[in-house]
Structure formats: C-alpha cells, structure tokens
C-alpha cells in the first residue's frame, strides 16, 4: 500500500468518526428539589457545560425541605462567586458527563 492510500484511509477514518460525542447533563426546567432533579439529557454539540442554578433555599427553622434547583446543558455557563454575598440565584458550572448531580456546599439529608 502506498503512502498516498494510507493517508486517504486515515483521512476517511477520521472523517467518519465525527467531531466527538456530546456529553450528558441532569436537567429540570422548572425549580425542582435538588434530590429529585434526575432527568438525563444528551447535550447538543455546541454545549460546553452542565449548569445548576440554586433557585430557592429554605430560610426558616427547621430547614427540613430540600433546596430547589434548575439544571440544564449550557453553551455559555458563567458561574457565580461561591463566596459572593447577596447572590440571589447562585450558578454552578461543570464540564464532565453527568457532573451536575449535586450543588457545592449542600449536603443531602441534613
């Protein structure tokens, strides 16, 4: 086999593989209890992150309800400063397959 044919076969193999496979994120469009938001969606090729937005947190004792979140695939996720004061709806971004199952700083079951 000549070098030319080898190059064509290599080019054809690379082309047939496509650009890669999109990753998956947990999704819930409406505010949902953090432990209940478990729908899995295949993200679009242009999506680069999984996004979680903290919508509500119980502010009164006895704190026995789970925080409400929305989750989605995102093509432009801008995380908020986790130490920021007064952020109404903190945003968490992550960049792996199914990485948005939790929320930083929240411990389930407490």
From Swiss-Prot:
Keywords: Cytokine, Disulfide bond, Secreted, Signal
GO CC annotations, alphabetized: extracellular space
This protein's name: Secreted Ly-6/uPAR-related protein 1
Gene that this polypeptide is encoded by: Slurp1
Subcellular location: Secreted
Protein species of origin: Mus musculus (Mouse)
InterPro entries associated with the record: CD59_antigen_CS, Ly-6/neurotoxin-like_GPI-ap, Snake_toxin-like_sf, Toxin/TOLIP
Cited SUPFAM superfamilies: Snake toxin-like
Gene3D superfamilies per the UniProt record, alphabetical: CD59
Swiss-Prot/TrEMBL induction comment: Down-regulated in the cornea under pro-inflammatory conditions.
Chief location of this protein within or outside the cell: secreted
SS bond list: 25-50, 28-37, 43-73, 77-93, 94-99
Entry keyword annotation includes Signal: yes
UniProt record, GO biological process: locomotory behavior; negative regulation of cell migration; negative regulation of cell population proliferation; negative regulation of keratinocyte proliferation; neuromuscular process controlling posture; urokinase plasminogen activator signaling pathway
Keyword check for Secreted: yes
Function, in words: Has an antitumor activity. Was found to be a marker of late differentiation of the skin. Implicated in maintaining the physiological and structural integrity of the keratinocyte layers of the skin. In vitro down-regulates keratinocyte proliferation; the function may involve the proposed role as modulator of nicotinic acetylcholine receptors (nAChRs) activity. In vitro inhibits alpha-7-dependent nAChR currents in an allosteric manner. In T cells may be involved in regulation of intracellular Ca(2+) signaling. Seems to have a immunomodulatory function in the cornea.
């Amino acid at each position: 086999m000549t070098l030319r044919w080898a190059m064509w076969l290599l080019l054809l193999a690379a082309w047939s593989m496509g650009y890669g496979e999109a990753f998956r994120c947990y999704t819930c469009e409406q505010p949902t209890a953090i432990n209940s938001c478990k729908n899995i969606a295949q993200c679009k090729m242009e999506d680069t992150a999984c996004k979680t937005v903290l919508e509500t947190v119980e502010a009164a004792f006895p704190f026995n309800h789970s925080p409400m979140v929305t989750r989605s695939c995102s093509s432009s996720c801008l995380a908020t400063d986790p130490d920021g004061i007064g952020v109404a709806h903190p945003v968490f971004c992550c960049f792996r397959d199914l990485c948005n199952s939790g929320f930083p700083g929240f411990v389930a079951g407490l």
